[in-house]
Amino acid sequence: NKKTTIVSFGHRNPQGLYYSQKFDFILSTEHGPKGGDEINMNIQPFLEIKNFGWPISSYGEHYSKHYTEEILKEAPLNKSHKKFGFEEPIKFFNPSIGISQVVSINEAETEFFIGAMGNEIKEQDLGIHYIKLNNERNKIINHSYIPLNERVRDMIISKDKKTVVVFLETTSSLAFLRKLDN
């Protein structure tokens, strides 16, 4: 007998998922509609079911302006989550970066690489985003970008957290990012 538990809903198109059993949180990435890619944090996911807002709230837009009032009523894409009772993303990208995988790169589980598989290096969507969270893991305190000029489809990290294997879609190749000892 396997027991399953729903811990959240209101996700549009999840791409990356990281669960920390040690610190009890889930960090997820998801594609928004035309813009509005999100990084979502679910702290203590087993205490209460959280709603991240889709399709009521999104920082993206509908792909077409030719929607009926009925569709817009069901999916208004309000530009606030909190105002409508939903969890706000800890970060959203507008324009979209084509967000993909998320991996933790340190033992404290406060630093992460997030892949981007968009189309424009100038929009910071062909490479890897680095984020650092505060100790409570509810806010990004540092964000930078590593341009690769490649669509980053997936990443995995070694057990010692010193090597990240990056799956590059543009050239169908692998890259290795290694942490240098100081």
What are these regions (language model features)?
Residues 1-142:
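Beta-propeller domain segments
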Residues 145-148:
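Short loop/turn motifs that cap or connect beta-strands within the blades
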Residues 151-155:
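Repeated scaffold domains used in trafficking and secretory/extracellular systems
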Residues 156-182:
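Blade-level signature of beta-propeller repeat domains, shared across WD40, Kelch, NHL, RCC1
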